[in-house]
Amino acid sequence: MRFDPSEIGEVLEMLLFRELDIRAVTLSVNTLPAIRPTVGDTLAALEETLEPLLKRLRPAVERVASRLGVKIVTVRLAVSPISIMLEPIGKAEAAVEIAKHLDGLAEKHGVDMVGGFSAFVHAGVSRGDAALMEALPEALNSTRRLAGFLNVASTATGVNMDAVRAAAEAVLKMEPHAAARFAATANMPEDVPFMPGAYHGLGLPDAVVNIAVSGPGVIEAVVRNMPNADVRTLHDAIKRAAFKITRLGELVGREVAKELGVPFGSVDLSVAPSPKVGDSVAAILEAVGLPRVGAPGTLFALALFVDAVKKGGAMATSTIGGLSGAFIPVSEDVVMAEAAREGALTFDTLKSTLAVCNTGIDMAGIPGDAPPDAVAALIADVMAVAVALDKALGVRLVPIPGAKPGDVYDLGGLYGRVVVMDLGKYRDIPLARRKGTAPPAVERLKKG
């Protein structure tokens, strides 16, 4: 990669004054060689597989950050789906032991999060899947760095309503900090660097580095400096800023991969917000011209923003991966959270944004006593969109015990302040109790 002086100068300004950083360096490692018939042997094999890379990961990231003068917010690990590793064991207690062991390894080596406590159950549930699903609440409640998901739908197979219900019931048994590390998903790609969707895909090499970028403050500044620009000019300016953000992401990823001696994988183009003021995707949408995110025009502003980010990112790198859409977690974006607290942002609004490249309903609070029917039905709605439009989508809900709509619960760190949102008045939804798998949409026929 070659950079001209003006590009370097612009990126330096972004780094120094616009909160530009790299959200995550995610090392993805194949842990399937650690499959063993007993949990004790599995734990030992996991350690043997992971430690040679883990002990070098944090130092490598810090060397690259220091050398380039770039802030890297989190260092993460993604492992092969743990449900596969549970196939020969088939016990929930083993899943919990593996979860705690991975959490301990992450803490030991300065890794902020571990992804891959996951199962793909969009077409049915295997022995290992069942063990992981049973263990999910206890495993996540008893850890702090582990993340996972249940992939409950796919364009190829449709929506597994049994798995949707299981995901809803699991979430409602989780403490807030645990639910923030779990999602129900559809069509989850193999190279996602963001949590809780990260895992090591079956088509990847033994180890690979994937990058999650950030920098909404950069794009907000660009938009606010153009109050009278027409929308095409505004789109072009956002696209150019996204190009620079993505180029930085690829540079960091390649340098870390070189330090570790593993291949570089991909850059997720999603511009990730954080709870800090000046680091908000929703603020970009309001700078485009919304009085408040959630107002009429929100979908247009979001579509304009995401299209520009994708086009700028696609020009910057040929290694596009992950979700690469609009990443707008409600609690992790201070402006989104405020809009939700005011009632400007509702679940209906969030569902409508799925059509223009939002990556799901993310980090939204719900009352701790929310009815399972309502939670399952909400997940099913999102999965239906994912199947119909062939999109990768997720639902990450955070139940807050004793809370009512409008209440706020501070999770701290990157998770921010969770606003409890109204799921609606319907507690009894028979549809959410129907079993079986809804067939895939006609979109499936395009794959033939």
Curated annotation (Swiss-Prot):
Coiled coil: none annotated. This is UPF0210 protein Pisl_0759. Belongs to the UPF0210 family. HAMAP family: UPF0210. It comes from Pyrobaculum islandicum (strain DSM 4184 / JCM 9189 / GEO3). It holds the Pfam family DUF711. PANTHER family: UPF0210 PROTEIN MJ1665 (PTHR37560:SF1), UPF0210 PROTEIN SPR0218 (PTHR37560). NCBIfam families: PRK05313.1 (NF003700).
